[in-house]
């Protein structure tokens, strides 16, 4: 397996860097006025990737904060992955043609599987499938709806269609700093035989070490958000902690 990659997260709403609790738009904390400044800070601490979420886009169903995404992709020596409201071929092409390394397709994977399969066929590893689950079932529409589809079943189906990278979020853990759902992340990796990036709940370097210890199952990285913003640890400390394992 390749190395374990850390993805510092920048969630964008109204052009600012924010965090929500469990995806609740009414529980918002603003951490900065400039996504580019935040990304620059992470790059200076050693980030190789930046994970961007367009929260306005997730709600609206089309891209909203794309100018900030392109500013980061074009001016920093990091790879960028973007999710949030990307539901059309035009939006996928827009990002990939403008220097974004990976586009995350989320709720459309349930509601419009033909679109997702077409994008996988066209762009391969530049597409990541975001699987957000609540109690093991896939959640859609910016976490506002829960489907009757099991996370592993969706993963297996899309792996057959060419998906190489999944991002798994346990919604109940997200923004709670209660530790990641390692078991569910590993289950998805084993079910699909593909790379799975863990997201949600990471509160310590020890949490990252637990996930990194599952590299052989296919758990290939972790997205870190609130822990960095609430200064539980710095990105530099996380990188150093993984180097020691």
Curated annotation (Swiss-Prot):
Protein name per its UniProtKB record: 1-(5-phosphoribosyl)-5-[(5-phosphoribosylamino)methylideneamino] imidazole-4-carboxamide isomerase
Classification via InterPro entries: Aldolase_TIM, His_biosynth, HisA_bact_arch, Isoase_HisA-like, Isoase_HisA-like_bact, RibuloseP-bd_barrel
CDD domains associated with the record: HisA (cd04732)
Main location (coarse class): cytoplasm
GO cellular component, one term: cytoplasm
Entry-linked HAMAP family: HisA (MF_01014)
Amino-acid biosynthesis as UniProt keyword: yes
GO biological processes: L-histidine biosynthetic process; L-tryptophan biosynthetic process
Reactions this protein catalyses: 1-(5-phospho-beta-D-ribosyl)-5-[(5-phospho-beta-D-ribosylamino)methylideneamino]imidazole-4-carboxamide = 5-[(5-phospho-1-deoxy-D-ribulos-1-ylimino)methylamino]-1-(5-phospho-beta-D-ribosyl)imidazole-4-carboxamide
Cellular compartments annotated: Cytoplasm
One Gene Ontology term of the molecular function aspect: 1-(5-phosphoribosyl)-5-[(5-phosphoribosylamino)methylideneamino]imidazole-4-carboxamide isomerase activity
Family note: Belongs to the HisA/HisF family.
């Amino acid at each position: 397996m390749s190395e374990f990659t850390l993805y510092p997260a920048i969630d964008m709403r109204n052009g600012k860097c924010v965090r929500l609790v469990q995806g609740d738009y009414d529980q918002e904390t603003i951490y900065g006025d400039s996504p580019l400044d935040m990304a620059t800070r992470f790059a200076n601490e050693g980030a190789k990737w930046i994970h961007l979420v367009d929260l306005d886009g997730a709600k609206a169903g089309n891209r909203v904060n794309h100018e900030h995404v392109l500013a980061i992709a074009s001016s920093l020596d990091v790879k960028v992955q973007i999710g949030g409201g990307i539901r059309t071929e035009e939006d996928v092409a827009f990002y990939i043609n403008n220097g974004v390394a990976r586009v995350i397709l989320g709720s459309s994977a349930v509601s419009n599987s033909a679109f997702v399969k077409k994008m996988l066929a066209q762009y391969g590893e530049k597409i990541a499938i975001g699987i957000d689950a609540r109690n093991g079932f896939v959640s859609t529409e910016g976490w506002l709806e829960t489907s009757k589809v099991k996370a592993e079943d969706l993963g297996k189906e899309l792996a057959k269609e060419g998906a190489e990278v999944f991002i798994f979020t346990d919604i109940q853990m997200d923004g709670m700093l209660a530790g990641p759902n390692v078991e569910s992340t590993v289950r998805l990796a084993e079910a699909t035989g593909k790379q799975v990036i863990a997201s949600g709940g990471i509160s310590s370097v020890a949490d990252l070490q637990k996930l990194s210890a599952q590299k052989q199952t296919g758990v290939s990285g972790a997205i870190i958000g609130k822990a960095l913003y609430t200064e539980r640890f710095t990105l530099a400390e996380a990188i150093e902690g993984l180097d020691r394992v």
